Amino acid sequence: MKEIKLILTDIDGVWTDGGMFYDQTGNEWKKFNTSDSAGIFWAHNKGIPVGILTGEKTEIVRRRAEKLKVDYLFQGVVDKLSAAEELCNELGINLEQVAYIGDDLNDAKLLKRVGIAGVPASAPFYIRRLSTIFLEKRGGEGVFREFVEKVLGINLEDFIAVIQ
């Protein structure tokens, strides 16, 4: 496995199933899988920061990122590759040291350039072909956690070490 120094993720279609709910007053709702919070835990446990890159700009994503202590949040991103390159420059790392999980067309350029690329099983086939790591879960089913655990090689010994 490559030495990863940053984990980046999309939100819709990864942390969620891609569905969006609106109430009668226009409020947007998203359903997050709480299992994905363990992905943040494991990354931080190994000293690796996590960043969100999403094309949407919503208060609910900001609140979720804040609650989980996500290190970097970029909303309303049009060009995810450029945003990731800028962050890498700030951190003094290169894209080969980044693991990224995304699920659709606006993720493709970045998926092609990072050290480890993950794609949920629910993504279109032409996006899944960009994945360098096999993921079984679909978006909204804890795929971010699965991705982080595979990228970092989390195993039973790691789990036992944190519960003792």
Swiss-Prot record:
Changing R64A: Loss of phosphatase activity. Its EC number is 3.1.3.103. Binds 1 magnesium ion per subunit. InterPro entries: CMP-NeuNAc_synthase, HAD-like_sf, HAD-SF_hydro_IIIA, HAD_sf, KdsC_fam. Changing E56A: Strong decrease of the catalytic efficiency and 4-fold decrease of the affinity for 2-keto-3-deoxy-D-glycero-D-galacto-9-phosphonononic acid (KDN-9-P). Belongs to the KdsC family. Involved in the biosynthesis of 2-keto-3-deoxy-D-glycero-D-galacto-nononic acid used in cell-wall polysaccharides. Catalyzes the hydrolysis of 2-keto-3-deoxy-D-glycero-D-galacto-9-phosphonononic acid (KDN-9-P) to yield 2-keto-3-deoxy-D-glycero-D-galacto-nononic acid (KDN). Also able to hydrolyze N-acetylneuraminate-9-phosphate (Neu5NAc-9-P), 2-keto-3-deoxy-D-manno-octulosonate-8-phosphate (KDO-8-P), phosphoenolpyruvate (PEP), gluconate 6-phosphate, tyrosine phosphate ester and glucose-6-P as substrate. Homotetramer. This is 2-keto-3-deoxy-D-glycero-D-galacto-9-phosphonononic acid phosphatase. It comes from Bacteroides thetaiotaomicron (strain ATCC 29148 / DSM 2079 / JCM 5827 / CCUG 10774 / NCTC 10582 / VPI-5482 / E50).
